[in-house]
Amino acid sequence: MSSSAKKQTLFISTLIISWYSSNIGVLLLNKFLLSNYGFKFPIFLTMCHMSACAILSYISIVFLKLVPLQHLKSRSQFLKVATLSIVFCASVVGGNISLRYLPVSFNQAVGATTPFFTALFAYLMTFKREAWVTYGALVPVVAGVVIASGGEPGFHWFGFIMCISATAARAFKSVLQGILLSSEGEKLNSMNLMLYMSPIAVIALLPVTLFMEPDVISVTLTLAKQHQYMWILLLVNSVMAYSANLLNFLVTKHTSALTLQVLGNAKGAVAVVISILIFQNPVTVMGIGGYSITVLGVVAYGETKRRFR
């Protein structure tokens, strides 16, 4: 292997490890803050994430020029981005709320059903049909979650509803983005989209936070007095949320779609194992079996979609 090839391999490997670390890290830290630390403010936590994304996106694109700045060219394009921002907000808030009530392992199992909702919304909104064998691969995706739900000792109905809603919203945003920003003149890469979406999200979340979580400031200040690392944890958590988006963009840029798909599936499994080791939440054979069926269904769906285009 040549020196340049070795450097490229090392670079991509470092990217993937960093991507895994930031994604899994922010997930576990969210769970720790919301369930184990007494910080029960998922909407405010999401607003912190969006604030960090807004500031760091601006620095990365405008000052550091990591990617070229893409300008919004019309009021129509701005309204489309704002719509995506609200849907994106809903998915992140729903996911964070669910972490208050569900173990990370089960949260990831439900999140693995994203392809099912993506296929459903693609059909309902664009009438795009896949081959029947592709839809058939989605059966174990859903069946696995049903089985995992029955075998989950920490099952919580409200947490489950929020988690499934967040998963559906994430898929809806993906399909909606393909529809709204489909013309060449309006397409934005994920980093520029984050640059415009995150400040809109902060503006949308501020009144919701004040209404739904009115005591957030007083409780956070009290927690900060009790736990000296409170502000550091919040800051690190928010920066990691941005890093996860940046590294996702870089991994997508430097690897193939198939590699990204495989890495994404494996990432969920790694997150499950690490979360069980850290939080020591009880798991059952039925729960593990259900999650395994879901992951295999996701892999089969990706493969059939690739083959039967």
From Swiss-Prot:
Tissues showing expression: Ubiquitous.
Stretches that traverse the bilayer: 9-29, 43-63, 78-98, 104-124, 131-151, 152-172, 193-213, 231-251, 256-278, 283-302
Transport keyword on record: yes
Pfam family, one: TPT
Protein name, UniProt field: UDP-URONIC ACID TRANSPORTER 1
Highest taxon above the source species: Eukaryota
Entry keyword set: Golgi apparatus, Membrane, Pyruvate, Sugar transport, Transmembrane, Transmembrane helix, Transport
Family, as annotated: Belongs to the TPT transporter family. TPT (TC 2.A.7.9) subfamily.
Membrane topology designation: Multi-pass membrane protein
Gene Ontology cellular component list: Golgi apparatus; Golgi membrane
Function (record text): UDP-glucuronic acid transporter that modulates the polysaccharide composition of seed mucilage. Transports UDP-glucuronic acid (UDP-GlcA) and UDP-galacturonic acid (UDP-GalA) in vitro.
GO biological process: mucilage metabolic process involved in seed coat development; nucleotide-sugar transmembrane transport
Alphabetical list of SUPFAM superfamilies matching this protein: Multidrug resistance efflux transporter EmrE
Location(s) in or outside the cell: Golgi apparatus membrane
Main location: Golgi
PANTHER family: SOLUTE CARRIER FAMILY 35
Transport keyword on record: yes
Disruption phenotype annotation: Changes in cell wall monosaccharide composition with a strong reduction of galacturonic acid (GalA), rhamnose and xylose content in the sead coat mucilage composition.
